Amino acid sequence: MENKQKTATTVKVSPGPLGYVYARRLPPEGLTELALLSARSADSDTAVLPLIAGLTVESGFDVNVAVVVGSRTTGVGGTGVSLKLMPSHYAPSAYVFHGGRHLAPSSAAPNLSLLCDRARVQFGFSSFKPKPCEAEGETTGEALCEHLGLNPNESLLYMVIAEGFKEAVYISNTILHMGGVGTVTIAGEEVRRIPIYPLQMFMPDYCRAVADPFNDRHRAIGEYFAYPLPFFNAKLASLLFGAAVGPAAVALRARNVDAVARAAAHLAFDENHEGAALPADITFTAFDPTGSKAGHRNPRECGGGFEQRLASVMAGDAALALESIMSMAVFEEPPTDIGTWPMLTCQESTAARAASIGAYLGRAAGLVGAMVFSSNSALHLTEVDDAGPADPKDPTKPSFYRFFLVPGTYVAANPQLDRDGRVVAGHEGRPIVPIVGGNHEFTCEHLATLCGFSPELLAKMLYYLERCDGGVILGRPEMDTFKYVSDSAHTDVPCCLCSLDNRHSCAHTTLLRLRARHPKFTSTTRGAIGIFGVMNSAYSDCDVLGNYASFSAIKRMDVQETARAIMQETYRSAVERVMAELENLNYIDAAVPTSPAKLESIITGREALQTVVSNVKQVVDGEVAQLMRALVEGRGFRFREALGEANHAMSLTLDPHASVPCPLLQMLGRRSNLAVYQDLALSQCHGVFEGQAVEGRNFRSQFQPVLRRRVLDMFNNGFLSARTLTVALTDGACISAPGLVSGQHAAAESGFEGDVARVNLGFPKEIRVKSRVLFAGAGPAASEAARARIAGLQSAYQKSDKRVDILLGPLGFMLKQFHATLFPNGKPPGSDNPNPQWFWTALQRNQLPARLLSREDISLIAFVKRFSVEYGAGNFVNLPPNNISELAMYYMANQILKYCDHSTYFINTLTALIAGSRRPPNAQAAAAWAPRGGTELEAQARSVVANPGDHPGAWTTMFASCNLLRPVMATRPMVVLGLSISKYYGMAGNDRVFQAGNLANLLGGKNACPLLIFDRTRKFVIACPRAGFVCAAVSAGSGAHESSLCEQLRAIIAEGGATVASDVFAAAAKSLGARVQQLQIEDWLALLEDEYLSEEMMELAGRALERGGGEWSLDAALDVAREAEAMVTRHVDAEETFDFGAFAEDGPADAGLAVHLQSRRRPLACSDLFGDAPAEKRNDLTLDML
C-alpha cells in the first residue's frame, strides 16, 4: 500500500450550539418506522434513535458544525469576551428521555434494566448515582413540555448532541437556552427545538470540565454574568451513562464509569490536553491466561507484571484521546435522508415501508450475530496480556507485539487489582476464572456487558439475536422453545427475569436457543481482531488478482500521459472490458453478474454451450494478450515481480454517519475502532517503557504524551489514512448564543465575536485492509518461528496433481444446469429424469453404455474434457466456478499467472458471505415475537407466521456466498471481517513505524457464521449491502476447526459419483430430522452452493412428505433416498461401454467412438478417472506468445 502524503484542505463550517433538544407531538405516521430503527427496552421510557434526516431531524440538517465550547477574555485588561469555537460533528444517535414508551420496544424481553444492574454489580462496574444537588435542580421532560405548550402524554423529547460532548451533558456541564427556542419541519410536522450550550460560556478562559456545576458562586464565573441553571435530566443522564459511556468503559477496562465520562468531557473542552485523562486509581483484572490451577492461584500471581498493567491503562488513555480527536473531525457525507432510501421509494403504504425496514434489519442480524459469537470479536477483546520480551536474552529490545488484547468476557468477574497488583477492597475471595479452559457459560450478564450495561442497546442486541439461526442449517440440535416454555411450568428455571407468560421472549431463552453458537475461547495468543466496518466507497481492489498492474504501478514517470490512457492498460480495466463483453453477448446481467438466468435463453443445445465457452475463452485470451503486450512492450512493466506485490484491498470509513441507521450497529463500529486504536497504542508501549523507571508515581503523567504522540505519528503509514483540514467559518457567519448577562431565558444575542480553537486539524479518515494474492512462503530473512509457521501452511496451498470430477471442474455448473438439454438420454435405466451425477459418474468410470451416446454427444464430451483438462492443468484458483462470470475471471487470472510463470501454490481468494433475510420459515423461529406466551405460545407463534403483514419486524437472517467480491464491495456494504495489524520500521535507520491491515478470518467457525469454512487459501468477509437499500446504488488464524453438516455435505459432493443427490439427502435427513422439511431453496443453496442439487433436494423432500402422508418420517425420507440411489445405480446388461479414460483429450471427436468391453468391477476412485495429464509447460515469455 503506497504512502500518501498529508494534504491540507480548507473546509468551512457554520457556528452553532452543542446540540438541540427536539420536542414534538407524536407523529401521526412513521412511528412504526421510528420504533423499528430505535433501541428501546420494554421496561424503560428512554430510547436511542438514529439521526436520520426527514425522520428525527429536519431535511438538510448539517452535521458539521463549529460548536460553542466556551468563552475567552479579550482586550486590554481582559474586559472583552469572545466565544471559543471547536469544529465537530453531531453524533449519529439521538437520545429520547421523554415519551419513549410510545415506541414499540425493540424486544419484548422483560426486566432488562434489572439484568444490566445485576451485571454491573457482578463485574464490578459502577452504577449511576445522581448527586443530591442534581436531583434538586432537575429539568424534567414534563416541565419542558409545559413550557413549550405540548401535552406531556403525547409528546416525544430527544436530544441531538455534538460528538464528544455527550459526556458533558451527562455531568451537567450544559444549559438549555430557553430563550432561543426555534421551529423546524420534520416530515411535514412542526417541531420545536431548544439549543444546548456549555456552562463554560459563563466561565471565561475555563477550559476544562466543571466539577460542581450547580455551584452558582464558582470563582470562575464572569463578573456580572447571569449564571444559568445547568441542564440535568435523570432519565437522560441514566441513558447516556449506559448507552454512551458504558461501551467505552467496558472497552477500556475502566470499572469507574463516571470517571470515564469526566475524562472524556475534559478532553472535549481542553483541546491542548495531552497527559493522562483516566484516573490514577484505575483497577485491573486478575486473570490466568494459561488456565492452570484455575481458582486456586494467588490473585497477585494472576495480575500480570507492573508493565502489563501500565500498558493496559496507558493504551486505554491513548484510545480515549484518539476518540476525542475523531469527535472534532469534519466529514463530507451528509446524514442519511429517509426520503432517499431506495428500498422505500416504491412502497406506498406505511405497512409496506415498515416491512422493508424490518427485512433490511433482518439482514443486519447476520453481522450482529457474527460479532457476538466470534471468539476474536472486538466486543470480547477487553483485556491486555504480556507476551514477554521478543528476545529473552535482551529483555529491553522493543517489540511491537509484546502487549496485545485478549478476550476478557469470561474473566470480567475476577478480582480487581490496584496499580501494584494488590486485590482491591471488596474483591477478596473472588475466584479467578481462566480465559481458556474452565467451564465457561455465556450468560445474559455477559451479553449485557457487551452492550455497556445499557438496557436500550441490550434490547436492540436481542432484536438481532432473535433473528439469528440457532444451528438448524448446521445440523445442530436446536432447543424446542415451545417444549421448554411448557415444561418450565412444572420445573425450576434458572432465570429470575421472567414468568411463564413472557418466558418465550426472555433474554435467557434467546441465549438458550443459540447455545450451540456461544463463543468459546481456545487461545490467548495474539491474533486477528474481528471488527465491524462500513465501505463508504464503491471502489475496491477485490478482483481475483487484486491490485495487480494498478494505475500507480504502471504509471511512467518519464512520460506525460492522461490518466484515462493509463487506466485503460490496467488489470482492473481489462476485467471491466471482459465483463462488458460478456454483457454484450447477453451472457450475464450487469446488475447481478453471478446470476445464471441469462444463459437459460442462450444454451438451447450442445452447439450453444460450446459456443458460449469458446466465446468466453476467446474474449479472455484476447484481453490478456492485449494487456500483457501493453505492459511489456509499452511500459516495460516488471509483470512477474509485480505479481508478488499484488494485494486484494478495500477501505473502511471511520465516518460514524456511514453506518446503517441503527444505534447498536453504531456501537459495534465504535467498539471496533476502540479495539484498533488500542492495538496501535499497545504496539508502542514497550518502546516507551524502554530504559525508564516505570514504577515511578509520575511515570504515567510524564510519558502519556509521549505515547500519544507516537500513536499520532502512525497516521498515513499504510493503515490509518489521515486527513489534514484547515477549518474556517463560513463567509458572513453570525455567531448566535445566549447573552452572558441577560441569561438563558432571554432571546439569543448575535453580536458575539469568536474564533476556531483548532484551525489545523488532522484526523483518521479510513482504515485500509489488504490480503496478499500470492502465498509467498518464508523469505531468507524470516525467523525460525516464521519458517515453522509457513511450513505448516505450504500443504494447504500446494496445488494437487489429482484430477477433479468433471462436475467439480470449470464447466460443472453449466453441465448440471443444462444437463437435460445437452444429454436428454443421460438418465439412469428405468428413469424418465436426466441425471447429471449418474451420467458423468458412469461416463468417467467407463460404465456408460455406448448405445446411449450419439455422435453429437461424443463431440460435446470431447469438448468438455479437453477444456476441463486444459483449465485444470493451469488452474491456481482453489475454487470451482459457480457461474459464467466466475469462469471468465478465474480463467483470466490463470492466464495471467501462466504469463508470470507462476506454479506450485494456489493463490488466495476472497469470498463474500452476503447476509439476506426472509420471513420466519416455521413457528419455532417466530416464538420470541408471539404476543402472548404460556399455554397460548404455539398458537400465537403460528399466527405470526401465517400473518406476516401484521408483523413488519418478523424476519430471519440467512446467508449466500459469492466469490466475486468486487461487485459486492461496490454496494458499499457493512462488513464484519478479521483484521490483523502488522507493524514494522521503514528503511534502515528510519524510526518511522509503518503498519499493514491484513485481512484475516473470524475465529469460531460456524458459531460466527453458518457458511464459514476452514480453508487457509480463502478469506471471508461477511457483508450486508447498503447501496440499493439505504443509499443510492453506484454504477459500476488458529480457530478450532469444526466438522459440521455443511462440510459433510460438501465433502460428499467433492467425492462425486452417481449417488451424490441421494447421499446428500440421506445425510441431511439423518442429521436434521424433521427440520429438512423446513429448509427452503435458499437454505440448500447456502449448504451446497449448487443450484441443481438444491432443486433436487427440494424435490426429494417433497416426495418424502408425500410418502409419509403429509407428516415427516425419517423412514420415509430414507426410503426416498434409497429409491433415488437405486435409480442411478441400477445395473445394465453386459454390453459395449464408452471408454472415457481412453478417450483422446487432444484428438478428434470421432476417436471417442472406439469402445471397449468393460467387465463389471469396482468403480475407480475419482483421482483415477482420467489419463495422464500433459506435462506443464513453463516457457519464457516471448513476443510471439504475446
UniProtKB/Swiss-Prot annotation:
It comes from the Viruses. GO terms for biological process: DNA replication. Keywords: DNA replication, DNA-binding, Host nucleus, Metal-binding, Zinc, Zinc-finger. GO terms for cellular component: host cell nucleus. InterPro entries: DBP_sf (IPR035989), Viral_ssDBP_head (IPR043031), Viral_ssDNA-bd (IPR000635). A motif (Required for filament formation) lies at residues 839-840. GO terms for molecular function: single-stranded DNA binding; zinc ion binding. The keyword Protein biosynthesis does not apply. A zinc finger (unnamed) spans 495-508. Residues 1160-1186 are annotated as: Required for nuclear localization. The keyword ATP-binding does not apply. It is found in: Host nucleus. Pfam families: Viral_DNA_bp. Homooligomers. Forms double-helical filaments necessary for the formation of replication compartments within the host nucleus. Interacts with the origin-binding protein. Interacts with the helicase primase complex; this interaction stimulates primer synthesis activity of the helicase-primase complex. Interacts with the DNA polymerase. Interacts with the alkaline exonuclease; this interaction increases its nuclease processivity. Belongs to the herpesviridae major DNA-binding protein family. This is Major DNA-binding protein. It comes from Bovine herpesvirus 2 (strain BMV) (BoHV-2).
